[in-house]
Amino acid sequence: MSSAPPGPAAPRLCCMEKGPDGYGFHLHGEKGKPGQYIRLVEAGSPAERSGLRAGDRLLEVDGTNVERESHQQVVERIRAAAGAVRLLVVQPQPEEQPPKTHSDPDGEAQREPPAAETPAAERSGPEERELRPRLCRIKKGPNGYGFNLHSEKSRPGQYVRAVDPDSPAEAAGLRAQDRIVEVNGTSVEGKQHADVVAAIKAGGDETKLLVVGVLADEFFKKCRVVPSEAHLAGPLPEPMANGDVEKENGGEPRLNSVSERPPSPALATSPEGSETHSEPDTQEGDKRSSAPSSLLDLDIPLAVAKERAHQKRTSKRAPQMDWSKKNELFSNL
């Protein structure tokens, strides 16, 4: 005699108090489908200790049914709880389980969280997501990876200039204007164009790129922090406001300014000797550093002062570019 199929699982009430890093779970909603699901429960978190499990479907928040509420409404309910929350959940039947892979309208890789996913209700959804770096794993196709890498004179770094439609790069979530931070786990901050291209090619038929979009790039620069894989899902840094005082390596405090940047060479060249980009800010740095000495020469004749200024400007001027090598600034990969 065959046994009857098991009935639906009983709902469970999970009571948790917010810890220093939040509740410790990720809430996930499918576009066009009702219901909110627990996608991930962090080890050792208040959520794990309360009995919350990945895959649970959320029924109630503090006694209020949320099965028909939108993702953002549920997130706001959890955030409104004063340091503690009670979640009524149920482990769904196998046919109810949400798919484990996702894609969004931007064509981002399955490794990216979907637009309706919020870590422990601590974030504000899409806005916070745009501030995070993205990890794009790309397998080379018949026509290569399908993106164009370039550098600019006006700003340091290597940027994605274009992504071919239906290419491996597009499928992996790479976007135009992305800045390359790491190639195959190695930082390329401050590297020259040719070095970054070589690092990508060294990966053979597959490469792993950590990138930041325009908003994320601006955010991390304000925070004065180099993005890393730790920022894919971990806590984000806090931006530093102008006038904040910071101590470095136990030394004297210094005044932070958003416009300050690490020192960089005025002209970066590839091994072949072609120009990749120049950094105008270093000229400003030269002016600042030379200011004290110029104050000592106030009594020199005006004609001599003009001649010295002209010599300084011409000495800092970058050599003219060999336009026959311009293609080395733009590399199709």
From Swiss-Prot:
One GO BP: regulation of protein kinase activity
UniProt lineage? Eukaryota, Metazoa, Chordata, Craniata, Vertebrata
Which SUPFAM superfamilies does the entry link to? PDZ domain-like (SSF50156)
- Give the source's domain of life in one word: Eukaryota
Q: How does it sit in the membrane?
A: Peripheral membrane protein
Give GO terms: molecular function aspect only.
Answer: chloride channel regulator activity; protein-membrane adaptor activity; signaling receptor binding
**Entry's PROSITE patterns?**
PDZ
Which Pfam family, giving just one, matches this sequence?
A: PDZ
The protein's location, in the record's own words, is: Endomembrane system; Cell projection, Filopodium; Cell projection, Ruffle; Cell projection, Microvillus
User: PDZ domain location, by residue?
Assistant: 13-93, 135-215
Q: Where is the composition biased (Low complexity)?
A: 112-122
Residue numbers spanned by region Disordered: 90-164, 232-333
Q: Where is the composition biased (Basic and acidic residues)?
A: 97-111, 124-133, 274-289, 323-333
Chief place where the protein resides: membrane
Q: What does this protein do?
A: Scaffold protein that connects plasma membrane proteins with members of the ezrin/moesin/radixin family and thereby helps to link them to the actin cytoskeleton and to regulate their surface expression. Was first known to play a role in the regulation of the activity and subcellular location of SLC9A3. May enhance Wnt signaling.
Give the UniProt keywords, A-Z.
Cell projection, Membrane, Repeat, Wnt signaling pathway
Q: Which organism is it from?
A: Gallus gallus
SMART domains of this UniProt entry? PDZ
Quote the protein name from its UniProt record.
Na(+)/H(+) exchange regulatory cofactor NHE-RF1
Concerning InterPro entries, the annotation shows: EBP50_C (IPR015098), NHER (IPR051067), NHERF-1/NHERF-2 (IPR017300), PDZ (IPR001478), PDZ_sf (IPR036034)
Q: Which GO terms describe its cellular component?
A: apical plasma membrane; cell periphery; cytoplasm; endomembrane system; filopodium; microvillus; microvillus membrane; ruffle
